[in-house]
Amino acid sequence: MWSVMGLVRRTAMSSTVNKASPVRSLLGGFRCLNVESKEEDEKKDMTVLEAKKLMRLVNVEDMKKKLIGMGDKEMVTYTTLIEASQGLGIARSLDEAHAFARVLDDAGVILIFRDKVYLHPHKVVDLIRKAVPLGLNPDDELIREEFDKMRSMKEEIDVLAHQQVRKILWGGLGYSVVQIGIFVRLTFWEFSWDVMEPITFFTTATGIIVGYAYFLMTSRDPTYQDFMKRLFLSRQRKLLKSHKFDAERFKELENKWKITSCSSSSCHANASIRNRVGVDLDLEDSLQSHHRD
């Protein structure tokens, strides 16, 4: 940093001397020299300020990376931030540490309030937004109406997809019960265990092979939860296509609405179906499935 400052000063001083010489020789007085030197000093000061600003911006970016280590904390004390900036070598003195803290606060990287430093300012803004409702402009009102309409339509599609998935799962349970009943009947009434043992063995081995094939195709563990999620997304994709639902437009409206007035999890479009199905679903899964069609 000091090498850059010294280079700027030397450049400005050399330009001052070079430009002051012809003024002295032509006018033969010191008044013009003083005026010229003043202008050059102002230019030099502006250049130094610009260099300081540039170096501060570089330190802000460096401090952003260093603060990732504190990312698991919501808030630290101001003293902790000052000690961290000095310990990381970003600030050489206490005054520089205070200056860097002000720069971080001005840049919106952190929020300094009294003796507390909030490392996630956007969360503080969300809390204030929920506590103090903001008025909507006409454009936001149109966005809200369109978003509510599409969200209601998507909730109906999700409920219908969930009902179809439940029917399929209950059908699978019925198939398993009937299969076991048939094996019991054949083992103890029609045939004997010597005859049914190979049949049950190969049936179980077939189930294991199917689970392994599922893992190879999906790169996921063959769990009932994952199978239910994929089955739900498959039914949801078909219903979205049949109802001509624009998932990309809905995602855009959801992002705008979350930014303008809604930040809680209950405002997300997948909150109701997540509570009903018990599976963590994301609209991006629906978009990716929709693009594969």
Swiss-Prot record:
| Compartment annotation | Mitochondrion inner membrane
- Main function: Mitochondrial inner membrane calcium uniporter that mediates calcium uptake into mitochondria. Constitutes a pore-forming and calcium-conducting subunit. Mitochondrial calcium homeostasis plays key roles in cellular physiology and regulates cell bioenergetics, cytoplasmic calcium signals and activation of cell death pathways.
Per the record, the GO terms for biological process are:
calcium import into the mitochondrion; mitochondrial calcium ion homeostasis
Q: Name one GO molecular function term.
A: metal ion binding
The name this protein carries in UniProt is Calcium uniporter protein 2, mitochondrial
Which PANTHER family does the entry mention?
CALCIUM UNIPORTER PROTEIN, MITOCHONDRIAL (PTHR13462:SF10)
User: Record's GO cellular component, any one?
Assistant: mitochondrial inner membrane
Pfam families found in the cross-reference section = MCU
Quickly give the catalysed reaction: Ca(2+)(in) = Ca(2+)(out)
For this UniProt record, give its keywords in alphabetical order, as a comma-separated list. Answer: Calcium, Calcium channel, Calcium transport, Ion channel, Ion transport, Membrane, Metal-binding, Mitochondrion, Mitochondrion inner membrane, Transit peptide, Transmembrane, Transmembrane helix, Transport
Q: How is it placed in the membrane, per its record?
A: Multi-pass membrane protein
Q: Where is this motif: Selectivity filter?
A: 193-201
State the family named in the UniProt similarity comment for this chain: Belongs to the MCU (TC 1.A.77) family.
Point out the transit peptide region. Answer: 1-33
User: Can you tell me where the transmembrane regions are?
Assistant: 168-188, 198-218
- Residues annotated to bind Ca(2+): 197
